[in-house]
Amino acid sequence: MDEEENHYVSQLREVYSSCDTTGTGFLDRQELTQLCLKLHLEQQLPVLLQTLLGNDHFARVNFEEFKEGFVAVLSSNAGVRPSDEDSSSLESAASSAIPPKYVNGSKWYGRRSRPELCDAATEARRVPEQQTQASLKSHLWRSASLESVESPKSDEEAESTKEAQNELFEAQGQLQTWDSEDFGSPQKSCSPSFDTPESQIRGVWEELGVGSSGHLSEQELAVVCQSVGLQGLEKEELEDLFNKLDQDGDGKVSLEEFQLGLFSHEPALLLESSTRVKPSKAWSHYQVPEESGCHTTTTSSLVSLCSSLRLFSSIDDGSGFAFPDQVLAMWTQEGIQNGREILQSLDFSVDEKVNLLELTWALDNELMTVDSAVQQAALACYHQELSYQQGQVEQLARERDKARQDLERAEKRNLEFVKEMDDCHSTLEQLTEKKIKHLEQGYRERLSLLRSEVEAERELFWEQAHRQRAALEWDVGRLQAEEAGLREKLTLALKENSRLQKEIVEVVEKLSDSERLALKLQKDLEFVLKDKLEPQSAELLAQEERFAAVLKEYELKCRDLQDRNDELQAELEGLWARLPKNRHSPSWSPDGRRRQLPGLGPAGISFLGNSAPVSIETELMMEQVKEHYQDLRTQLETKVNYYEREIAALKRNFEKERKDMEQARRREVSVLEGQKADLEELHEKSQEVIWGLQEQLQDTARGPEPEQMGLAPCCTQALCGLALRHHSHLQQIRREAEAELSGELSGLGALPARRDLTLELEEPPQGPLPRGSQRSEQLELERALKLQPCASEKRAQMCVSLALEEEELELARGKRVDGPSLEAEMQALPKDGLVAGSGQEGTRGLLPLRPGCGERPLAWLAPGDGRESEEAAGAGPRRRQAQDTEATQSPAPAPAPASHGPSERWSRMQPCGVDGDIVPKEPEPFGASAAGLEQPGARELPLLGTERDASQTQPRMWEPPLRPAASCRGQAERLQAIQEERARSWSRGTQEQASEQQARAEGALEPGCHKHSVEVARRGSLPSHLQLADPQGSWQEQLAAPEEGETKIALEREKDDMETKLLHLEDVVRALEKHVDLRENDRLEFHRLSEENTLLKNDLGRVRQELEAAESTHDAQRKEIEVLKKDKEKACSEMEVLNRQNQNYKDQLSQLNVRVLQLGQEASTHQAQNEEHRVTIQMLTQSLEEVVRSGQQQSDQIQKLRVELECLNQEHQSLQLPWSELTQTLEESQDQVQGAHLRLRQAQAQHLQEVRLVPQDRVAELHRLLSLQGEQARRRLDAQREEHEKQLKATEERVEEAEMILKNMEMLLQEKVDKLKEQFEKNTKSDLLLKELYVENAHLVRALQATEEKQRGAEKQSRLLEEKVRALNKLVSRIAPAALSV
């Protein structure tokens, strides 16, 4: 039991520790609430909190207090007390509170209930049980309460450890049930031999016929197990059970071993199963033989017993029916195997429910008539029913006894409670009676006082208010005094804070002085080094002699100082031992040696003679220089290593990226080369088609002259239509291309990978190239960019070729018609061609030499209608970008075929002329003009404008005078000069400026092109006689009439041929437009890639420059390292010389020790000040608590005043009652007056009647009497009325005074509340001030800690200096003999 209780207590402690968040072993209110919620004690939570914590919100409890309070609360809730008389009910309540853990048929496992014994055994063992229960009464109620909080985990653990014990419990209970049921012996008639467990077990063994020798074998143990319902045990389980019971290992189980194993849980008690486990042995084991004559008697007795009973109560669910499987299962438990045949023999269906009452009567009938098997089944049923009912009756009897005991205990407790409640009620009644009497007496006195002495009460109220006001004023003065004291303390704390800040400032100043002294020492050290390291010093020998003398003197002084230092150290240790421990400085060391802060001691002792002064500070500076040098060296080495690693990583990354870019560039270049080859093939095909068309045009030009006349307007009309369609289509294609290009550019602008791609394109295709090749590649790129104005060269070639073809046709036609007109026309051709070329070549590369023949090139390549001029401003940058891309893709020697095309055309034109001087023989001016006009420039615009204006202002389109070839050459030379000048400006300017100039040139030239195209279209629609000039009209009048018919036929034929050729030409133009658009897109892409390539090249150059700069810095750092190594060697040699001067440290050791003592004293003073601050803070907290208490007192006073105010209100209400009574009496008196008046009137009326009857004298007398009586009555009424009015006024004045008093009291209370609020605000302000003081104190403590840390650092440095002094002394002792010997 103790182990089980300890287990529960340990579980409770684990839950308790899980709620202990602070780890202190105590729980506050919140943590205790959380613990109760974990233990599912929501109902007991308020009682438990009140029991453990009370009304204190800051109280805490430990585990023992919680355990005691927890058990007490649970026991009080359950109605259980730790007493002798209710320990058994605790045990029964604890056993019945926990349900079984596992149910298997009729077996229940895991319950801790203890089966009750029979009444006789209980009566026999009641005395020892009471003794054992008395020994366990101290913890039974605790276990009952602790079992309620047992976790499921502990139940599962306990289940595994106590499984065997539970089985033994069930076995023990089954033994008793078997003993009572199978053999028909009721529990009340148990023999005395079965009073003990040993006798019961021995009796069972005798009944089973086993254990005759006092021991059980394995087979006999199997029989016993079958008898108690464990017939399903296998051989291995039986062997394990036998080995467990056989503790001595002799191969047998004795009675004591069996009893010990059976009652191992609690051997002092014979336990009984909490559930009814039916014995499963065969019915034949205890069946009464049929031969004996006891069968009928047994049956009759059973029938008589069961005549008023129903069978199958255990399986009856209240409906009177049961499943056949249930009946068969019950019979199989009783050992009857052929239950199905029995049911069928009794005419019951196996598939439907069985009526239990009919089955009972059938069995009852069959019990007397049917054979032995049916009788056995009936007997088994009756036996089972009787045993079940008997168990139920016994259980009810036990429950009745327990309920009776519980009722008796409850009645006892109720009696005690009733007594306590009677006492409480009596005391409460007495108190209430006393209070009521006291209140009645007080109210009576107050009523009497209010009725008689209202003025006195008012004075009393005024006096009370005055006293309260004085008390409040006194409280306010006291609080003001406390506030003044707090302010004084605050000022003191602020002063202390300022003082500490000043001390910190002084320490900082001292540190700055030490730094300045260090700088001074460094200068001295440099001076000494300069002086000492001079090899040509003349006084070196004399100085060594003086050094020897000085060393001897210093040795003597060192001995004296060391003796004195020892004496001071001894005195210091004595003083240190006398000091209290709590005032010791944390930075004190027992050896008593301290170091002075740098710069606080003397400057040192200098050497004699002419040598520079060398002090101890110089030595310190040398040490610092060495340390600084070492730090610099390590930092430099780390930086050098870091930069080397970075440079190596950069090189690796650069090589990797360069290889990737080379590969990607190779792939891109291969793709671009393939595209370029395709475009060249397409260009060659288009040139072939153009040449074929030109030849066809030349063939048609050699035909008869009338054919040319009819063909010209058709050609012009067809070409105008083609030009318009081509212009609209090309404009649409350009818009789409521009939209796609802008989208691609916006998308590609965010892709950094394009930059790598362009860089790869710029790299050479085979491995890394030297810088010379890269430079040459950049030059080539710049040259290609400079050749951007030649982007429209091929279009110019096509325009020139077409214009020349038209010109050849016109020349041939004019030659056949009229020689002079043809000559004039041929002379005008070069001029017109140049003028048109200069006016239109700059925008689209067009060169139409005659207005009538310019439609084809305009329709092909450069549409110039009004729509184009409207979009000139928006399309200018895109045309420039297309020209730039074409310039980048077209190689440098590309202009050669362009100049070759016009030369061929001029060579074809030469034989057609009349004279050799008419047509120029050199084609260079046209090539030059074409090349010059293609380049954009602002300087060319005035010339082009003047030429265009001159050509437009002429009176006629065809000039008859001849122009020599010299004028053409002059114009070509001027154009060549313009081209060179623009080339120079291009080389000087940037690419952006050139593009802007080109845009301006295009904008200036497009209106001319537009006017020209409109004029051409207008002329194409006019009749032939309006299109030609005056010479042409004169030529037409000279034609003969017979030739008109032939010319018409020939013209119709040529017209049909030209229509077919025009259709074919239109298809070719469409294909060329598609290819040109594709080529322009490719050129744009290539131009963009080339720009990105240039940017990446720039980045690459910058990265290389950075690498070169890093390499140069690396070389400089290496040089610095070498210089520092040399300096280090030099410093080592200098240190060997400076080590001789360490003797000067001995003079300053005493001063350092004194300074350390001073610092220790300052630290002790700081500690004392900190203690004072703590004391002041405690005082402030106490004063704050007093202020809070005073505030609480004032709140209590306010509550008292409120109570008095309520009393006054009640008195006012009580005064209102007499006021109402007085008003009622006044009304009654008024009614009486009215009644008197009525009576008076009646009396007067009667008197008048009597007067009439009475004589006049008598009447006069009566009048006088009546007047006298009336006056008296009036006086009395007036007096009564005045009295009533006075009373009313007095009551009204009292009420008003009471209301005034109430108002004054309310005002006073409000003033007090306001004052208390102000006081509370002041208290909060004082709290804030206290918090600020705490913060300042914390800052001061931190500053003190910092000073202490500095002091510790000074002590450490002093120790280091002492060690250095020792080492220097050793060095001096070694060096001094050598110096003296020299």
Curated annotation (Swiss-Prot):
Description of post-translational modifications: Phosphorylated by PLK1 which disrupts its centrosome association and interaction with gamma-tubulin.
Lineage of the species this protein comes from: Eukaryota, Metazoa, Chordata, Craniata, Vertebrata
GO cellular-component term (any): centrosome
Organism, as annotated: Homo sapiens
Motif D-box per record, residues: 633-641
InterPro entries: EF-hand-dom_pair, EF_Hand_1_Ca_BS, EF_hand_dom
Keywords assigned by UniProt, alphabetized: Calcium, Coiled coil, Cytoplasm, Cytoskeleton, Metal-binding, Microtubule, Phosphoprotein, Repeat, Ubl conjugation
Positions bearing Phosphoserine: 148
Localization: Cytoplasm, Cytoskeleton, Microtubule organizing center, Centrosome; Cytoplasm
Segments carrying motif KEN box: 495-497
Biological role: Involved in the microtubule organization in interphase cells. Overexpression induces the fragmentation of the Golgi, and causes lysosomes to disperse toward the cell periphery; it also interferes with mitotic spindle assembly. Involved in vesicle transport in photoreceptor cells. May play a role in ovarian carcinogenesis.
Subunit structure: Interacts with gamma-tubulin and TUBGCP4. Interacts with anaphase promoting complex/cyclosome (APC/C). Interacts with CDC20 and FZR1. Isoform 2 interacts with LCA5 and USH2A. Isoform 2 interacts with DZANK1.
Residues that bind Ca(2+): 246, 248, 250, 252, 257
GO terms assigned for molecular function: calcium ion binding
Main localization category: cytoplasm
Compositional bias per record (Low complexity), positions renumbered to this chain: 991-1004
Record-annotated EF-hand domain positions: 7-42, 41-76, 196-231, 233-268
Pfam families in UniProt: EF-hand_7
Protein name: Ninein-like protein
Domain comment as written in the entry: The KEN and D (destructive) boxes are required for the cell cycle-controlled NINL degradation by the APC/C pathway.
Coiled coil: 384-424, 484-579, 616-699, 1046-1375
UniProt gene name: NINL
Composition-biased stretches (Basic and acidic residues): 150-164
Region (Disordered): 144-164, 857-969, 982-1006
